[in-house]
């Protein structure tokens, strides 16, 4: 009888498999593979080699704390000559004496997560078991049978493999972009993402059920949406805060990447990191989903409605002086960010595959938990409010009507309705380019089109009862060129009288500093014209000067000023409202790269910023990071104040680890100028072979 097989070594071929599965940037010390795609391991036996017909080889793969075959968290399969579809398989590739090359493959519906791999070798009645090591299995956007399959290679590179991106902010009238280091392949990030799954409340409640559902990106997306915020006291990653008091943490505007946030969360023992706002929640969720293999992108909706009572109407109240009053919990955010993830929806009727909206910012509860989605973007566009998950809330974010109630001194209220204010310029980064792609058409039909009215009717929203008021007077607010931080600037109310007679009116213009979520601060400009005569079929403009000395001390991290114009006609008592959010532009950070950009070769970055204010900047800090370029974050604190019109500057050495296109990202903070962002694309040449 042949002596039993004894395994001497096993090579999981981490480097080779990583290249073939596009996971090599996660490191060569662990095996990370994508489901449905074969990976190769090498077995070296001591003494004699494997003999077909004499020896039997089988493999066990297990994931989770209580693996069970019926739950899909354990599989036992034997070595064969050809792979089997739809199940785990092991195929003999090559034998050289005592060395065996075996190709293993998971089904395209396998559970994602960390697996234990075991070899069972038997000869006759003798048998031994050998632990071969652990590996991590991810979703596979390259496999046609995977639920996250994405057809175009350039889209897979952008939405799964790209570690850097741009997030759109500012206002509808002045869209800005901020760089973000997603860093899903950076050290520790994969382990942190898996840990997030293993401490989520659904796992703690029923470990077997939770692990059995990890083959479904819909389920994973819902878990991640809940775990990125901490509002359910579930060991979530980020604590949200919107009141401009961030002294005991980080201002949301100061972050430039997810890596620092996720590492802090782990270092804190899975306690919330302070603080996040919508783009931070969305960016961290995007990192986690890309890390797990799900195509994901951050999306920005301008003039985003927060409809708390579900009636698809946002009620806002203004005093006679144009000051906003808080009588409703409904809000309009200058912008709001969420994540889109690409996946099929076999849990729904046909037609809802593709991009799904996931919103980890804690706003409203869904099934008792602060999470939102996945909501099929197609269902949002069609007004299919009964489709899972959370369609009514997202539908309102992009479609709600806005009603301004002007509260008069005697308590009487006048109504001014605006039905095409919400859901503008829905934006995401273009594939392969640093430019903005407008995806509004994927969420809604053109404003005022017959199809749009049809969708509203389906959403059981009687839009006709709120028809846009056709006043004979019309008003809009325009901005003079360049509202630069540190400078004075003008805004103009343009008023047109489209009637045949002269109108006597009162105009009030009010400017206040504001946060991006619609909250307003102190007044920084006001004008009250008691007797404004408007000639028939004429337009005239009224300027309002806004001074830095008035807005500067109260400007929030969002660099926003909200201008409200209220025009009241004396004869009828009717009012017209116009509102504009003005974005105050920060100075540019200039970045120069010195040296030949090559892998493993030292480079120098020269970083400069001019102080545009008429007063010194104190406590100046530069924070620099870039996936594949820097080892974590670099922080440079300047010793001296930066005088008016002087430069804040420093030089930094770094050694790029990875070839290809990368972004070097910079954040600047000081006592009077905060959240200033800049980036430079750097193409790193590979090492000569």
Curated annotation (Swiss-Prot):
SUPFAM superfamilies tied to this protein: Cysteine proteinases, E set domains, Transglutaminase, two C-terminal domains
Residues reported to bind Ca(2+): 399, 401, 437, 447, 452, 539
Biased composition (Basic and acidic residues): 431-441
Region (Disordered): 427-453
GO terms classed as biological process: bone development; cellular response to dopamine; cellular response to serotonin; peptide cross-linking; phospholipase C-activating G protein-coupled receptor signaling pathway; positive regulation of apoptotic process; positive regulation of GTPase activity; positive regulation of small GTPase mediated signal transduction
Tissue occurrence: Predominates in mature erythrocytes. Also found in kidney and cardiac muscle.
Cofactor(s) of this protein: Ca(2+)
Pfam families the record matches: Transglut_C, Transglut_core, Transglut_N
Site positions per UniProt: Important for catalytic activity: 516
Subcellular location: Cytoplasm, Cytosol; Nucleus; Chromosome; Secreted, Extracellular space, Extracellular matrix
Reaction(s) catalysed by this chain's protein: L-glutaminyl-[protein] + L-lysyl-[protein] = [protein]-L-lysyl-N(6)-5-L-glutamyl-[protein] + NH4(+); L-glutaminyl-[protein] + serotonin = 5-serotonyl-L-glutamyl-[protein] + NH4(+); L-glutaminyl-[protein] + dopamine = 5-dopaminyl-L-glutamyl-[protein] + NH4(+); L-glutaminyl-[protein] + histamine = 5-histaminyl-L-glutamyl-[protein] + NH4(+)
GO molecular function: calcium ion binding; GTP binding; histone dopaminyltransferase activity; histone serotonyltransferase activity; peptidase activity; peptide histaminyltransferase activity; peptide noradrenalinyltransferase activity; protein-glutamine gamma-glutamyltransferase activity
Cell inner membrane keyword on record: no
Modes of activity regulation: Acyltransferase activity is regulated by the binding of GTP and Ca(2+): inactivated by GTP, which stabilizes its closed structure, thereby obstructing the accessibility of substrates to the active sites. In contrast, Ca(2+) acts as a cofactor by inducing conformational change to the active open form. In absence of Ca(2+), Mg(2+) may bind Ca(2+)-binding sites, promoting GTP-binding and subsequent inhibition of the acyltransferase activity.
Record's keyword terms, sorted: Acyltransferase, Calcium, Cell membrane, Chromosome, Cytoplasm, Extracellular matrix, GTP-binding, Hydrolase, Membrane, Metal-binding, Mitochondrion, Nucleotide-binding, Nucleus, Protease, Secreted, Transferase
Residues annotated for GTP binding in this entry: 476-483, 580-583
Catalytic residues identified in the record: 278, 336, 359
SMART domains hit by this protein: TGc (SM00460)
Keyword Protein biosynthesis appears in the UniProt entry: no
Function, as annotated: Calcium-dependent acyltransferase that catalyzes the formation of covalent bonds between peptide-bound glutamine and various primary amines, such as gamma-amino group of peptide-bound lysine, or mono- and polyamines, thereby producing cross-linked or aminated proteins, respectively. Involved in many biological processes, such as bone development, angiogenesis, wound healing, cellular differentiation, chromatin modification and apoptosis.
Family label: Belongs to the transglutaminase superfamily. Transglutaminase family.
Quaternary data: Monomer.
Name of the featured protein: Protein-glutamine gamma-glutamyltransferase 2
Species of origin: Gallus gallus
Native organism taxonomy: Eukaryota, Metazoa, Chordata, Craniata, Vertebrata
